[in-house]
Regions:
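Anion-binding (especially nucleotide phosphate/pyrophosphate-binding) glycine-rich loop
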Residues: 60, 71, 75
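Generic transmembrane alpha-helix signature in multi-pass membrane proteins
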Residues: 24-26, 51-55, 76, 90-95
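Membrane-helix interface "capping/anchor" motifs
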Residues: 30-39, 76-87
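Alpha-helical transmembrane segments and their membrane-interface boundaries
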Residues: 1-50, 59-66, 104-109, 113, ...
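Hydrophobic alpha-helical transmembrane segments and immediately flanking/interface helices
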Residues: 85, 176-197
Length: 197
């Protein structure tokens, strides 16, 4: 039965291995910026496109693999769609064997694009059915602090701090801002009440 659905043992499977790692992110840590729809779909499509191009133009598979993964990371970073399993997508495009090589740029759309889209739709359905917000949106506190107790960090100041930090962190800017404001509010309450924990 599986042979009828999948085709012969030599045919390209409808699912590629990097999608297992994508599934871990989408279902296990759906709030991560690395697991958002743009990250999985954009990251995987970009990586597949770069991987196929590297495989086509670079004769050495080892060099093509290194170029594909490195270039995919650079482009994903610039497009703000970093998705770690996409590195494996780029690698699969280069080292996946004759069936994947025969697909050429078709590999970008099927299986990569199709797998990414179906996995994202599945994550939306599952996470929202189980009460988890996906795609993730920053939490807004239910009881904002009164104006007198609030300390502020402007969006520009937060952007400056993140730029000075110089590294990518696995939390969205909006979530970080909400957490920071919550921490400032609690610190202010401790100051006003004289309570130190």
């Amino acid at each position: 039965m599986s042979t009828a659905w999948l085709g012969s043992a030599n045919a390209l499977p409808p699912l590629i291995a990097p999608m297992g790692a994508s599934a871990v992110l989408l279902f296990g840590v759906p709030a991560s910026p690395l697991a958002q729809p743009w990250s999985i779909i954009g990251g995987n499509l970009v990586a597949a496109l770069i991987g196929v191009t590297a495989a086509h133009w670079i004769a050495s598979p080892l060099v093509a693999a290194a170029v594909a993964v490195g270039a995919a990371l650079v482009v994903m970073s610039s497009l703000r769609c970093v998705h770690p399993p996409s590195g494996a997508v780029a690698l699969t495009a280069v080292l996946g064997g004759p069936h994947i090589m025969a697909l050429g740029y078709g590999f970008v759309w099927v299986p990569v694009g199709l797998n990414s889209l179906l996995l994202t739709l599945g994550a939306i359905a599952y996470n929202n059915t189980t009460g988890r917000s996906y795609p993730h949106h920053a939490h807004v506190p239910a009881h904002p602090h009164p104006p007198i107790a609030r300390l502020f960090l402007t969006p520009d100041e937060l952007d400056e701090v993140l730029a000075d930090y110089g590294e990518t962190i696995d939390i969205s800017r909006d979530d970080l801002e909400v957490l920071f404001q919550e921490l400032l509010g609690r610190a202010q309450r401790h100051t006003l009440t004289g309570a130190v924990e």
